């Protein structure tokens, strides 16, 4: 059965499941799922199926309306808490407050020149800062656009991610209180890959 709200930007279910599974710590099941760029809610639906409470937001009111439809369609007889709000990523700490036992799983927005988006990069950095305020012991699992050369997955190569050398991106991640636990490329199509990134707090 198809979801009631769909857009071409919707993330494949297999990638949504992958990102959520990578956000789990050993022998620890998260309670809260937070996505500040929820889009059509593809990742949130997978988290809902896994029994998590859902806290998602988007700046686009069309997406907010659509994801409410999709989550209502997906919830079935489950008793999960679901909250969907229109909100900038820069304000999600004020929106949700402190939430222990959370994971942050998201696919940041980027434009037509996807892997060269400085705006998208700033949104990603804002998400890092806000996540630490909400839960200082959480995990972030996400994907950033990268050039197809990253599929070679040579650890000695400074690949271009979102238009910048990976070393610069990682430095910025560290400066915002996170360390990269995993970095692995995933093929999207011939000329575009996405770099799957999992981050844990530095402390």
Residue ranges and their predicted role:
Residues 1-203:
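Class I S-adenosyl-L-methionine-dependent methyltransferase catalytic core
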